[in-house]
Amino acid sequence: MSRFFRGDSSSDSSSDEEEDLYSDDEEVQEQPEEESSEDDSEEDDDDDDDSDSSSDDGAGKKTGANAFLKDDSDSDSESSGDEGVKVVKSAKNKRFEELEATAKAIENGEKINDWGSISAEFDKLNRQVAKLLQSGTIPKVYIKAIADLEDFMNETLAKQKVTPKKMNATNSRGLNAVKQKIKKASKEHQKDIDSFRADKDAYMESEDEEVVAPKQKKPRSSAAQDVAADDDDEGWGTVGKGGRTLQFTPESILKHLRTILESRGKKNTDRNEQIKIMEKLYEVAATPYQRIRVLLTIISTRFDMTTGTQTFMSQEQWKAAEKEFGTLLSVLETSREYVVVETAEPWEDDEKLPTVAEGGKFAIPGSVVSYVERLDDELTRSLQHIDPHTAEYIERLSDESDLYNNIVRTMLYQEEISKDASLNEPQRSLNRVVMRRLEHVYFKPSAVIKILDENCWKAVPAELNSTITPRGSVEDAKTLVNVLCNYLYINTEGEGLTKARAMLCQIYFEALHDNYYKARDMMLMSHLQETINSFDVHSQILFNRTLVQVGLCAFRAGLVYEAQTTLQEICGSGRQKELLAQGVMIQRYNQVTPDQERLEKQRQLPFHMHINLELLECVYLTCSMLLEIPLFAQTGSSPDIKKRVISKTYRRMLEYHERQIFTGPPENTRDHVMQASKALAQGEWKRATEFIHSIKIWELMSKPEEIKAMLSAQIQEEGLRTYLFTYAPYYDTLSVSRLSSMFDLSDRKVAAIVSKMISHEELAAALDQVSSSIIFRKGVELSRLQSLALSLSDKASGLIESNERTLETRTQGTANAFERQGGRGGRGGNRGGRGGGRGGRGGISNAPRQAGGTQFTGGALGAAVGSRA
């Protein structure tokens, strides 16, 4: 159908348009060309002589503007005639066809990747559209060409970045030229391009709808009267597919819902339109049953809108779903005769509503627990994709209070329906919502939990109350967490995972609030460390977070050894981000599939739940320093104890720091700890304290001044131990008061530390209570030769064991595998095996060696050294 067959257009406007579109010469030349073409067709085709001549006469009679203003009867008669009818074309129509041909040429250039021709054709396209713009409308073909060309250009540029392939000079110049031209053109027509990309089919169909002629033309006056009548009409109706008007009445609600449910999951389903329909259905709903059914369906439809490329629910849709869910709970709370349970049978009769007996209840299939869980998950996904350092994250996080209110109301509703045994509602549903409530409070400080819970009860209707956490009975956050956890311990029969997660949440809460010994005892008595590998990934992440929090709690309590031991498994691995679900680690050698990467990102925790990794590293390195530096001094000449390593990560960092030729002032946390370690090893405990105190990260802890005071005391004590280990061989006696003045400790504290070292056989000395001095025993330290001899003996022993294992493997454990000639028996032979050289299992050994390398090793070497002494 020609694009110029428009209805409701006056002859005046048509004549004005014609004067602008084509000249008199075109009008005069067009008709002879048509006649000549008809004569040629008459000579070639003898069968259609009459029809051709008649059509030629008809075409010659109608010229000018009247040729384009045909009524329906003319168009019908022409369509029923011969298909060879020629239509006189205006200049505008010709230019439009030229525009389409140029756009087609650009598409052909895209297929062969010929950017030179694409650039030339795009210039031609811009010149052609400039003439068509005189009518005031932008051709949609032009908008489509710009959008498609821009997409193709971006795709080409992306491929060039991934797999660089050198273009020839012509293509390269053409691509650069098109890039500049497209940038300018898209900027001028950005609004139209966005409309085209939003819905391409609808955008292009709108043009076709504009050019289609109506079947009946009305005079301009009658059309104006119709518009006025439409303006006066106060009613409205929704037009569905095929132009049918949808009538929304209370009686038709169930039928409309049935139609929407049947179309769920199908392709080409407009969910936005379905939501609008259901919003109108809710307005006309007359009974609680209808409202409940509509709300259940509309919430499910909103959740379906997040499928596809979108990874999380938009804030607008989430707020709408949250509001509708709150409305659903309000309807269920006021209409107690209707309940929503998972085990209910659906109502199949759409013609009538169900009747509820007096005092009875009617069950509607659904799950309010699943809805509130989905709201929680969607909020978490949204927080995962928002930059946490922006105001948008804070604004989005404020929605958590509304979600918490709905979780509590859902818990109250599940408590109510769980009391009715006839509904057969499983206990698991109530446990799920209680667990959700616990997961929203366990990681928060007590003050925040108290405010959150108080505001929640203010939003809950006064007539509602809970049997698990009655209104006003929970005085503080600790009581709330204990009540929720104890309920899950009792009512999770057969749900080991839920019980384990509840225990981890309680341990985390206790550790967060500095109850170290209770958190430690619960962790040890639960034996979760033995079975955690069989749990799901989310539970393993929670276990890692709890373990880290227990370690931080031990550090705040001044228990350095316990803190380092607890944090060793997480911090020593170098994968803190991955283990705590606070970031995706870049795998250098392992190939990660897109699905694995997507799942890893889905497990990430929102930023407000993160544990500060810099603080965690600082605590771990500080504890390692306080343990490793005295150990370095103790193992100066003992190769046996040197094998003991507390933290490989710390030692690797310290060795790297010592290899540096020039060491500047500390810039980060790690540099501060390394330089403090170096100062502590040299006995400069005051300088080490200054380095540790200058770390800014301590300010993030609850009581930073107490933490710094505790660290000062620990550094003083470990500095004293390091000094005694290092300089003990050079003293005969040492006054306690001198040590007290050197390390700014009381005499009693120094005496206690020295006594502990002597009792643990770390120091070969005696404490004289009368003179308040330390008397060192001489001759117990190994010389350099003795240390090398012991090292050689250890290596020889290891070589013998390796040879024996190799021989046993080859001989498959036969009886004569270890027989040797010349009396050189095995471990019990003349040479005593490993025991003969060092007083081991097969030889004669002296008194057992003491820990710390302060006594002899026994055997021949020990006897020789002892005789000299």
Swiss-Prot record:
GO terms for molecular function: RNA binding; translation initiation factor activity; translation initiation factor binding. Its main location: cytoplasm. Residues 1-92, 182-242, 803-869 are annotated as: Disordered. It is found in: Cytoplasm. PROSITE patterns: PCI (PS50250). GO terms for biological process: formation of cytoplasmic translation initiation complex. One of its GO terms (cellular component) is eukaryotic 48S preinitiation complex. Component of the eukaryotic translation initiation factor 3 (eIF-3) complex, which is involved in protein synthesis of a specialized repertoire of mRNAs and, together with other initiation factors, stimulates binding of mRNA and methionyl-tRNAi to the 40S ribosome. The eIF-3 complex specifically targets and initiates translation of a subset of mRNAs involved in cell proliferation. HAMAP family: eIF3c. This is Eukaryotic translation initiation factor 3 subunit C. The gene is nip1.
